[in-house]
């Protein structure tokens, strides 16, 4: 039986996008960000598809442990660090590198008893005001870490850019200057996320931390991955399970929100918000059928969507329907659904069959 909803993952696209990043930041090591199940693409799958990555970054200790148990040997930074003593000890046991962003974590770390010094990162709050230590707190933390024999030295430092995708906004320049003052001119630093490494030369430091770029998606509003020279890894697809003829004036779907303004040939595709397709996708959101764009009509249901096939008369039951990916950028669908592509990729649910290909 052919699964109704599937995400076709182009494994060659991972290598292409990684090479693109390497060319964009040739003097930087690459810490590939594969948190949140690799933005919906599969944590272990992504790690194995990126053997040239100098390190990986995950959000949580549990994610790092999964990678170690799968045999992933590269350095693994844990961006949220640890939240208790058990998390700290598990990080040490599995060779993870937690990011230190609070005095609470430092207090725990001072009590760590280990024969092998643990690698950690120190997080500077340069202006995003989420995680990290600023000004005097940062300086004190750096000194405390330098005095800890249980910590591998020297301790690298990172920060996160809040607005790097807005190239005409002064926030990033302010953050870069702030980080420069706190971190000083020497040391192992990581600044640039996807937008940062693309748009800000000063963010291409010893380490860059690309996330969304790895998956072939642009971090910039109004631009798509293919326009940047990237290849989408995920193509979300389903198939037509019904085709029917409607009359002018017929209402479609829950609430009858869409009223046919002409005799309409309607198709039903077996995918909905239960698969991760956005419920807020508006009438007119494009899908691909037989290589042609046709519009979504009516509300998105849990398991199905309705599309107008009037201008695609050759479409028939069983045809593939592409929701985003190859030929239809996920960035465009995100605009129609009033969201961001990160959300769409991360929200693909477990009942969607993941199919690996090499295009």
Curated annotation (Swiss-Prot):
Pathway field of the UniProt record reads: Amino-acid biosynthesis; D-alanine biosynthesis; D-alanine from L-alanine: step 1/1
Question: What is one process in the GO biological process aspect for this record?
Answer: D-alanine biosynthetic process
Q: Which parts of the sequence carry N6-(pyridoxal phosphate)lysine? A: 35
Q: Which UniProt keywords apply?
A: Isomerase, Pyridoxal phosphate
Extract one GO cellular component term from the record: cytosol
Residue sites binding substrate per the record: 130, 302
Active-site residues from the entry: 35, 254
What GO molecular function annotation could you give as one example from this UniProt entry?
pyridoxal phosphate binding
For this protein, what is the EC number?
Answer: 5.1.1.1
Q: Which reaction does it catalyse?
A: L-alanine = D-alanine
Q: Which domain of life is it from?
A: Bacteria
- Endpoints of the signal sequence: none
Q: What cofactor requirement does the entry state?
A: pyridoxal 5'-phosphate
Q: Which Pfam families match?
A: Ala_racemase_C, Ala_racemase_N
Q: Which InterPro entries match?
A: Ala_racemase, Ala_racemase/Decarboxylase_C, Ala_racemase_C, Ala_racemase_N, Ala_racemase_pyridoxalP-BS, PLP-binding_barrel
Q: Which family does it belong to?
A: Belongs to the alanine racemase family.
HAMAP family referenced in this protein's UniProt entry, alphabetically: Ala_racemase
Among PANTHER family, the record links this protein to: ALANINE RACEMASE, ALANINE RACEMASE, CATABOLIC-RELATED
Biological role stated in the UniProt entry: Catalyzes the interconversion of L-alanine and D-alanine. May also act on other amino acids.
Q: What is this protein called?
A: Alanine racemase
Organism of origin: Methylococcus capsulatus (strain ATCC 33009 / NCIMB 11132 / Bath)
Give the classification, highest ranks: Bacteria, Pseudomonadati, Pseudomonadota, Gammaproteobacteria, Methylococcales
């Amino acid at each position: 039986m052919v699964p109704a909803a599937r995400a076709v993952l182009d494994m060659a696209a991972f290598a292409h996008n990684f090479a693109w990043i390497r060319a964009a930041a040739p003097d930087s090591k690459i810490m590939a960000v594969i948190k949140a199940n690799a933005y919906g693409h599969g944590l272990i799958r992504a790690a194995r598809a990126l053997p040239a990555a100098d390190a990986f970054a995950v959000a949580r200790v549990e994610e790092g442990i999964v990678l170690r148990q799968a045999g992933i040997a590269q350095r693994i930074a844990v961006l949220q660090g640890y939240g208790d003593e058990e998390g700290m000890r598990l990080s040490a046991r599995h060779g993870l590198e937690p990011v230190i962003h609070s005095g609470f974590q430092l207090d725990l770390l001072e009590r760590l008893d280990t024969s092998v010094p643990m690698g950690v990162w120190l997080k500077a709050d340069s202006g995003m005001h989420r995680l990290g230590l600023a000004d005097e707190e940062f300086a004190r933390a750096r000194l405390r870490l330098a005095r800890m024999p249980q910590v591998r030295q020297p301790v690298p430092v990172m920060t996160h850019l809040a607005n790097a995708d807005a190239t005409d906004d002064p926030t990033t320049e302010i953050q870069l200057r702030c980080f420069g003052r706190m971190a000083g001119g020497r040391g192992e630093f990581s600044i640039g996320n996807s937008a940062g490494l693309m748009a800000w030369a000063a963010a291409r430091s010893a380490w860059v931390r690309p996330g969304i770029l790895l998956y072939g998606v642009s971090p910039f509003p109004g631009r798509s991955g293919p326009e940047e020279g990237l290849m989408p890894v995920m193509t979300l697809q389903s198939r037509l399970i019904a085709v029917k003829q409607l009359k002018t004036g017929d209402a479609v779907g829950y609430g009858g929100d869409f009223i046919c303004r002409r005799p309409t040939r309607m198709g039903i595709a077996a995918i909905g918000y239960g698969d991760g397709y956005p419920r807020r996708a508006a009438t007119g959101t494009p899908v691909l059928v037989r290589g042609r764009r046709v519009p979504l009509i009516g509300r998105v249901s849990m398991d199905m969507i309705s599309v107008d096939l009037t201008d695609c008369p050759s479409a028939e039951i069983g045809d593939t329907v592409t929701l985003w990916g190859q030929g239809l950028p996920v960035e465009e669908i995100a605009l129609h659904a009033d969201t961001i592509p990160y959300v769409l990729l991360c929200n693909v649910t477990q009942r969607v069959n993941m199919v690996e290909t090499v295009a």
